[in-house]
Amino acid sequence: MPTHHPITRQHWHHSWLSALALLCASLACGAKQVDVHDPVMTREGDTWYLFSTGPGITIYSSKDRVNWRYSDRAFGTEPTWAKRVSPSFDGHLWAPDIYQHKGLFYLYYSVSAFGKNTSAIGVTVNKTLNPASPDYRWEDKGIVIESVPQRDLWNAIDPAIIADDHGQVWMSFGSFWGGLKLFKLNDDLTRPAEPQEWHSIAKLERSVLMDDSQAGSAQIEAPFILRKGDYYYLFASWGLCCRKGDSTYHLVVGRSKQVTGPYLDKTGRDMNQGGGSLLIKGNKRWVGLGHNSAYTWDGKDYLVLHAYEAADNYLQKLKILNLHWDGEGWPQVDEKELDSYISQRLK
């Protein structure tokens, strides 16, 4: 029969502190967390900058990646071409990516509407991310690519930039429809390179009987490619976002020795044929994990993503997790860090 041990004062005290720590992690002990969607980051000098979906693209700054201050919005008004591309555009610019190149910061962004591929990816450029600098000014360079219903079986949102071993810069993108694509950018990183070179890098099954104007059931989007060792790692979000507690977003990964693929999962299945190894899915406290980016800073690797907090009416929160690697070179994250990383938004 089981043996029962008395609960000592020390054991009770330890259990109480553990419960309090978990409660503080869940509620951030009263501190206001950073609520972001589709987060990407970069660093200028000793300051990190965080970019999020929102009106004009919301920008935050931090010295330690934990305490964040509102910095600016990249757009004071919507891009002049937005309503032409997407008549039902609501003013929220989606899914940015930020990329440094030859002394400039390139901020890519998406114009779209839910469930439609009346979409375009644009880019705006700045010399600095410090709004106090006299050189701070966003200059919109317009549309990089545009998707048109019935013409294109892809959706021009969710851009992410990667430079290959030869210095060639590529853009990955895509959401639902025919999956995730990759193409070469031209020298000034504002348009596809000519002659154009495009690749399909990941997709899920879609019925051939579905009308091309419909998003379909292939729940895949938000590619992000990280170079590590001998491989390019393609992260993607499967499932549905933006549904509070009903969100099914989760992260999968594959890898390739070529930036153009094929990207294979741990079983050897091509991500172009439905492959993808689970990286993180979340738990009862944190759901809808996805739309990640990934970085190497000061010799350490990090996964940046949003997660919906059940204890706060499923409001989206910033998460920055340590990215580890197993013996076979596959990325790993510790789900416990969803509780231990708690951002604070400073006034």
Swiss-Prot record:
Gene3D superfamilies: Glycosyl hydrolase domain, family 43. Pfam families: Glyco_hydro_43. The gene is arbA. It is found in: Secreted. Residues 1-31 form the signal peptide. Involved in the degradation of arabinan and is a key enzyme in the complete degradation of the plant cell wall. Catalyzes the cleavage of the terminal alpha-(1->5)-arabinofuranosyl bonds of linear arabinan and carboxymethylarabinan to produce almost exclusively arabinotriose. Substrate binds at residues 35, 90-92, 115-116, 155, 175, 221, 316. It comes from Cellvibrio japonicus (strain Ueda107) (Pseudomonas fluorescens subsp. cellulosa). Induction: Induced by arabinan and repressed by glucose. One of its GO terms (molecular function) is metal ion binding. Belongs to the glycosyl hydrolase 43 family. Ca(2+) binds at residue 291. The record marks 158 as: Important for catalytic activity, responsible for pKa modulation of the active site Glu and correct orientation of both the proton donor and substrate. Homodimer. One of its GO terms (biological process) is arabinan catabolic process. SUPFAM superfamilies: Arabinanase/levansucrase/invertase. This is Extracellular exo-alpha-(1->5)-L-arabinofuranosidase ArbA. GO terms for cellular component: extracellular region. It catalyses: Hydrolysis of terminal non-reducing alpha-L-arabinofuranoside residues in alpha-L-arabinosides. The record marks 291 as: Important for substrate recognition and stabilization. Changing residue 114 to A: Strong decrease of binding affinity. Coiled coil: none annotated.
